[in-house]
């Protein structure tokens, strides 16, 4: 079976890091001010990414999926419980990410959020169909585009914006660190689904953690800077104020696709621990369809706390 290279793993986790969810989380750190906000981001990500690296090594060296690796500590029945919870939370996160991405895209181009749900869902299906070991070329193009576009966004926020406003002391430094740790920890139940496919799993775990950590910090900083320098907390308005327009739309859509793809794909892999006969890729496609449908018909604003509750089991 074809294995993924270090470069391919770096691309996968670059895509995971470029996320509107991470930008929005960065805006929440604005009460700390610029200096303390940056420090909280760095401290939180160092802690979170060390744990992410260790999780990747455990599953990667043993060529086990994230859920199968829990058998070592919790046995077969424990593994089933974790797998069911993981599939449940990943279906939920797939729906939420599609929903949030569609709302942000519709904030730039008002064609109806449901249309953007369909577009994002179809693109995720394309990513899944190509497969994790064959994504090299398509991921390279997508990541180069996202890299250039986010550089443009960073230039607007940090060099063309106003002076930073002072923090309000409404948030403790510890709370800020917790927010920064949250994103790396959210990938703990997923990372070995990808490092197990790597040619060099330990190096792939290290590269994945470092790339994700750097890019995630960058996204947090964009969010923090947007809140402090532009006074905006809405991702669509941030893009419009930056004068990005269609470019901003591409950032929103493709960052949502490259992040949510990992949720849907890992839901399929986790399901193999529950029903081994079911093909992981097929289940991932079903999860994407279900998530897209849910994002269209159900307001996703009120289930985030429930998903965080499930996710806390893995942290």
Model-derived regions: residue spans:
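Hydrophobic transmembrane alpha-helices that form the core helical bundles
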Residues: 79-110, 256-273, 313
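Transmembrane alpha-helical segments of multi-pass small-molecule transport proteins
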Residues: 12-16, 82-87, 108-130, 143-154, ...
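Transmembrane helix-loop boundary segments of multi-pass membrane transporters
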Residues: 26-39, 103-117, 133-141, 235-247, ...
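Membrane-interface "cap" regions at the ends of multi-pass membrane proteins
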Residues: 1-36, 134, 172-177, 189, ...
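Hydrophobic, small-residue-rich membrane helices and short re-entrant helix-turn-helix hairpins
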Residues: 2-4, 130-140, 166, 186-214, ...
């Amino acid at each position: 079976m074809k294995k993924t290279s270090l470069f391919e793993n770096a691309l996968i986790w670059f895509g995971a890091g470029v996320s509107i969810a991470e930008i929005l989380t960065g805006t929440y750190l604005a009460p700390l001010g610029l200096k303390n906000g940056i420090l909280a981001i760095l401290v939180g990500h160092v802690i979170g990414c060390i744990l992410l690296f260790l999780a990747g090594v455990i599953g990667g060296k043993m060529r086990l999926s994230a859920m199968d690796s829990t058998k070592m500590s919790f046995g077969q029945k424990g593994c089933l419980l974790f797998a069911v919870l993981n599939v449940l939370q990943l279906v939920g996160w797939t729906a939420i990410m599609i929903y949030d991405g569609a709302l942000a895209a519709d904030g730039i181009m008002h064609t109806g959020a449901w249309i953007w749900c369909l577009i994002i869902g179809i693109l995720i299906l394309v990513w899944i169909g190509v497969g994790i070991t064959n994504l090299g070329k398509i991921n390279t193009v997508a990541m180069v585009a996202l890299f250039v576009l986010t550089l443009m966004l960073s230039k607007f926020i940090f060099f063309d914006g106003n002076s930073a406003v002072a923090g309000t002391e409404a948030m403790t430094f510890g709370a800020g660190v917790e927010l920064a740790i949250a994103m790396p920890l959210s990938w703990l139940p997923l990372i070995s689904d990808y490092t197990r496919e790597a040619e060099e799993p330990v190096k792939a775990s290290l590269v994945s953690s470092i790339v994700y950590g750097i890019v995630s910090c960058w996204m947090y900083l964009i969010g923090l800077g947007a809140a402090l320098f532009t006074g905006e907390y809405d991702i669509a308005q941030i893009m419009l104020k930056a004068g990005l327009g269609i470019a901003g739309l591409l950032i929103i859509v493709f960052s949502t696709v490259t992040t949510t793809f990992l949720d849907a794909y890992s839901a399929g892999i986790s399901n193999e621990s529950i029903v081994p006969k079911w093909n992981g890729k097929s289940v991932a496609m079903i999860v994407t369809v279900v998530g897209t449908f849910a994002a269209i018909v159900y307001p996703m604003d009120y289930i985030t706390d429930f998903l965080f509750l499930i996710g806390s089991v893995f942290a």
